[in-house]
């Protein structure tokens, strides 16, 4: 299940690099969890992609939108400019018993 369906109070920390949310665990309790998005999202020439790394090193104005379901930013291109705002659906981030996990 997408983390957004079983979590609350999602925010970005560390300059947009870290997703933090309160996630419901199997016992029904709310547990604070964090996921370093630089371990699973990259920026290949101005577009965000899964299964890559370090998007935050080459992006600016990183935000959560749509109630935490989407991450947007202005990624840098190989020529050094910044592309218009790009987004990636965070549906690959799951809440696994109170932990944010990339799947």
Curated annotation (Swiss-Prot):
Superkingdom as given in the UniProt entry: Eukaryota
InterPro entries: Cyanovirin-N (IPR011058), Cyanovirin-N_sf (IPR036673)
GO-annotated molecular function: carbohydrate binding
Alphabetic keyword roster: Lectin
SUPFAM superfamilies: Cyanovirin-N (SSF51322)
Induction trigger: Down-regulated by nitrogen starvation.
Pfam family, one: CVNH
SMART domains reported for this sequence: CVNH
Coiled-coil ranges from the UniProt annotation: none
Family of this protein: Belongs to the cyanovirin-N family.
Function as written in the Swiss-Prot or TrEMBL entry: Mannose-binding lectin.
Protein name: Cyanovirin-N homolog
Species, as recorded: Tuber borchii (White truffle)
């Amino acid at each position: 299940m997408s983390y957004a369906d079983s979590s609350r109070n999602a925010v970005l920390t560390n300059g947009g690099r870290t997703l933090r949310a309160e996630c419901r665990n199997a016992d029904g309790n709310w547990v604070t969890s964090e996921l370093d998005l630089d371990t699973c999202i990259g920026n290949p020439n101005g577009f965000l992609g899964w299964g890559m790394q370090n998007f935050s090193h080459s992006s600016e104005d990183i935000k959560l939108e749509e109630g935490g379901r989407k991450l947007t930013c202005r990624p840098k291109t190989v020529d050094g400019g910044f592309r218009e705002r790009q987004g990636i659906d965070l549906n690959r981030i799951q809440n696994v018993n109170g932990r944010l996990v990339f799947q």
